[in-house]
UniProtKB/Swiss-Prot annotation:
Xref: HAMAP family: NDH1_NuoH
Organism: Prochlorococcus marinus (strain AS9601)
Entry function: NDH-1 shuttles electrons from an unknown electron donor, via FMN and iron-sulfur (Fe-S) centers, to quinones in the respiratory and/or the photosynthetic chain. The immediate electron acceptor for the enzyme in this species is believed to be plastoquinone. Couples the redox reaction to proton translocation, and thus conserves the redox energy in a proton gradient.
Cell location: Cellular thylakoid membrane
Catalytic activity: a plastoquinone + NADH + (n+1) H(+)(in) = a plastoquinol + NAD(+) + n H(+)(out); a plastoquinone + NADPH + (n+1) H(+)(in) = a plastoquinol + NADP(+) + n H(+)(out)
Domain of life: Bacteria
Enzyme Commission number: 7.1.1.-
Subunit structure: NDH-1 is composed of at least 11 different subunits.
Membrane topology: Multi-pass membrane protein
Protein name: NAD(P)H-quinone oxidoreductase subunit 1
Length: 372
């Protein structure tokens, strides 16, 4: 059974109340999804940057930012304004077109991937039936932008960083996709909505993390590598490559890389929440909540309540994972490039492939637990 609100339907019905036709209401709705995505992504980045600076300060027994607003909450905005007013420099011997296109090609696919993220039942920007396939396809574009940025800079450190970034992204893209395929196999759907609904039967006990513990670990490791977070930040290792493919960038072009990295981290955490932790699902079944409140399951108040708390649950699970990623960055050493590639090709790839085959076998043997 479906609970919650349909964002597009509710908006169109609201406009119809003012006498507008269905066609005009739909036209007004069309540009809003991308605007909502941009606002959600930017706000998420501001919160995550502030959290990272505060958590890293606590890990190193420092205070962290505290002067830009209360507890330094305005520090990310100050950083953004600083980068906005800095001079935009293109090196004399760089390829200007590729140099400019690189950061855009890195950022745009990550933002578009947010279109398939559901924050609640029917509360998503675009209900694409092949949402998982779309996300995997969009994420495969990013290595092209990274390699393009490194090559166009005409700098040896940038080129090495770009090559490392492309190799790392390709190496971890395959086990990541295989771990997601195991979820798709159990759900019989590529829709993120269907994947969450499949985990809503018995509260926390029906979450995919219990049926796919290996897939969960593989996905999270690969997601951190895709986001180039420590211990997988080889493409921009300061001690070796200055700043990797970002070395020659300044101002807003550098900010686009910075923005893309954090948006990708939040997106990865949201996808882990959706695929393995029940998404907007409660730890207890909604039927028990309705019984406790003595309300029918389709009561309007209960629908609004579950939709609102569902958003909080999705974001809370995602930021718990972001917190873990930040702690890992400031408490683990960087691996070598050969160790990085060995982990991806010699360990995670065979493990994710074996996990997919075992899931297929378990689905045939126990269809009631692993999808029919």
């Amino acid at each position: 059974m479906e609970y919650g609100l349909d964002l597009e339907y509710s908006f169109n019905e609201f406009l119809k109340g003012f006498g507008l036709s269905s066609e005009i209401a739909h036209i007004i709705w069309l540009p809003l999804p991308m605007l909502l995505v941009l606002v959600a992504a930017v706000v998420g980045v501001l919160v995550t940057v502030w959290l990272e600076r505060k958590i890293s300060a606590a890990a190193q027994q420092r205070i962290g930012p505290e002067y830009a607003g209360a507890l330094g909450v305005l520090q990310p905005i100050a950083d953004g304004l600083k980068l906005l007013v800095k001079e935009d420099i293109i090196p004399a011997k760089a390829d200007g077109i590729l140099f400019t296109a690189g950061p855009i090609l890195v950022l745009v696919p990550v933002i578009l991937s947010w279109l398939i993220v559901p924050f609640g039942q029917n509360l998503l920007i675009s209900n694409v039936g092949i949402g998982i396939f779309l996300w995997i396809a969009l994420s495969s574009i990013q290595p092209i932008g990274l390699l393009m940025s490194g090559y166009a800079s005409n700098n040896k450190y940038s080129l090495l960083g770009g090559l490392r970034a492309a190799a790392q992204s390709i190496s971890y893209e395959i086990p990541l996709a295989l771990s997601v395929l195991a979820i798709v196999l159990m759900t019989n759907s590529l829709s993120t909505i269907d994947i969450v609904n499949q985990q809503s039967g018995a509260g926390i006990l029906s979450w995919n993390i219990w049926r796919q513990p290996v897939g969960f670990i593989v996905f999270w490791i690969c997601a951190l590598a895709e986001c180039e977070r420590l211990p997988f930040d080889l493409p921009e290792a300061e001690e070796e490559l200055v700043a990797g493919y970002q070395t020659e960038y300044a101002g807003m072009k550098f900010a686009l890389f910075y923005l893309g990295s954090y948006i990708n981290l939040i997106l990865s955490a949201l996808l882990v929440s959706i695929l393995y932790l029940g998404g907007w699902g409660f730890p207890v079944p909604v039927e028990l909540i309705a019984k406790f409140l003595n309300l029918p399951i389709n009561a309007p108040f209960l629908q609004v309540f579950t939709a609102s708390i569902g958003i909080v649950m999705t974001v809370l699970k995602a930021y718990l994972l972001v917190f873990i990623a930040i702690l890992l960055r400031w408490t683990t050493p960087r691996v070598r490039i050969d160790q990085l590639l060995d982990l991806g090709w010699k360990f995670l790839l065979p493990i994710s492939l074996a996990n997919l085959l075992i899931t297929a076998g378990l689905k045939l043997a126990f269809p009631q637990f692993f999808g029919g």
